[in-house]
Every structure is written in C-alpha cells, then in structure tokens.
Amino acid sequence: LKGETEAIGKLFERTMMEKHGVQNLGEHYLVTDTICDATQERQDAIYKLVDEKPDIMMIVGGFNSSNTSHLQEISEDANITSFWVDTADRIDTENNKIAWRTSYGEMRETENWLPEGKLTIGITSGASTPDKVVEDVLEAIFMSKAETAAGSAL
C-alpha cells in the first residue's frame, strides 16, 4: 500500500514537471512526509512510557504494520525488555512462554518471560489494532501471571 501511494506521487510529480517545467515544480507540487494522528499519538505516548522504565513493554499489533514495528523499535532502543505480539495466541499461559517478533522481523520464543513478583508492564498497540486483540493480550498476561504465582506457591 505504501509503495502504491509512493508510485502515484511519483506519477503526479512527473506530470507536474511536464506541464509546468522542472524550474516551476515547487510552485505546483509539494511532498510532505506525514503520519496519521493515531500513529503520532502512539509514538509520542510510548516515548513517555519508556521514560518511566517499565519492567516489560508489550507491543500489540500486526506483524506487517510499519507503525507497530516502530513502537517495538522505540522500546528496544530504550533498552526495555519488550515483546511484540500480533495475537494473544502467542502467549502460552500455562508454560510461561511467549513467541514474539523483534522490530527487525526476527521471530523469537522466550521461556519464563513473565517473572514472579510485582512488576510494571507498559502496553501499547499499533494504530489499526482492534481493541479486542489488545483485550485478549491483556487477559493472557493476567492469566500467565496467575499461573506463575500459582506455580511458585507449590
């Protein structure tokens, strides 16, 4: 989709160059690099969140989402332990395992990802991630934490 948008922009630019000339292009054509409000709000919020140094960051969103990838990248760059999942199915609540993706696309699996005891978890999601997906991930985190606590009591 992004590639198609860029191709349309290039076609429009060439058309304006032919019609108005290269020297007059700036008067008739302007390129701006923008992101949607929802994406900008999430990026601003995660910068504030990582400044609070949570124990874990949970990034929720599609693996094909560039804005979600950037949220994971921000968290990684802040040296926060972070896990990017696209669905709650990536969290094995019974065995305290999580399958997750890095910002550069590598899939990983981590055992004992949710430590015992009190911790602070930051959570964010990509701009187009449905609320239901985020809710399911939160539920899986709570279930995992309950399993971890129950296991330590045995």
What is the predicted function of each stretch?
Residues 56, 118-120:
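Residues that mark the start of a beta-strand
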Residues 60-62, 123-128:
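Glycine-rich beta-strand-to-loop/alpha-helix junction loops that act as flexible
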Residues 1-112, 144, 148-150:
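Redox- and metal-dependent alpha/beta enzyme cores, enriched for Fe-S-associated oxidoreductases
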